[in-house]
Swiss-Prot record:
Role according to the record: Absolutely required for transposition of IS1.
GO molecular function: DNA binding; transposase activity
PANTHER family: INSERTION ELEMENT IS1 1 PROTEIN INSB-RELATED
Organism: Escherichia coli (strain K12)
Name used for this protein in its record: Insertion element IS1 4 protein InsB
Length: 167
């Protein structure tokens, strides 16, 4: 009988921390800087928005092609400064080959490094962009689900990346 259960009519209690208290890390702990080499790293940016489509929020991240994991991520505007923050997070890692699409800022930032510019060699990270859009409704382009604050937008996506890739 449903009325006899002590939990009938009440939501189950979980010990999930509130999203505002989350402090997701921005770099993986699975790969040790200096001791492990990242042979192929793909870099890309993904568009999202907070509140209205005119308030754009970009996710920049690097993906280890062989380990199939995200190495580091940052949020911000689609500028050289945000790309620079991502590159500073990636500086402790030994990356042999960088693979990006044709965005000109990648070319200027990766000057002097082994850099492949091709849509063919960014298939995995582009596929992962689609996976993120499928798993996180707030990243969908035409959706009723969207982030209302920049803080929660960054924390929810960062927490997802922590669970899937960084632990």
């Amino acid at each position: 009988m449903p009325g006899n259960s002590p939990h009938y009519g009440r939501w189950p209690q979980h010990d999930f921390p509130p999203f505002k208290k989350l402090r997701p890390q921005s770099v993986t702990s699975r790969i040790q800087p200096g001791s492990d080499v990242i042979v192929c790293a793909e870099m890309d940016e993904q568009w999202g928005y907070v509140g209205a489509k005119s308030r754009q929020r970009w996710l920049f991240y690097a993906y280890d092609r062989l380990r199939k994991t995200v190495v580091a991520h940052v949020f911000g505007e689609r500028t050289m400064a945000t790309l620079g923050r991502l590159m500073s997070l990636l500086s402790p890692f030994d990356v042999v080959i960088w693979m990006t699409d044709g965005w000109p800022l990648y070319e200027s930032r990766l000057k002097g490094k082994l850099h492949v510019i091709s849509k063919r060699y960014t298939q995995r990270i582009e596929r992962y962009n689609l996976n993120l859009r499928q798993h996180l409704a707030r990243l969908g382009r035409k959706s009723l689900s969207f982030s209302k604050s920049v803080e929660l937008h960054d924390k929810v996506i960062g927490h997802y990346l922590n669970i899937k890739h960084y632990q």
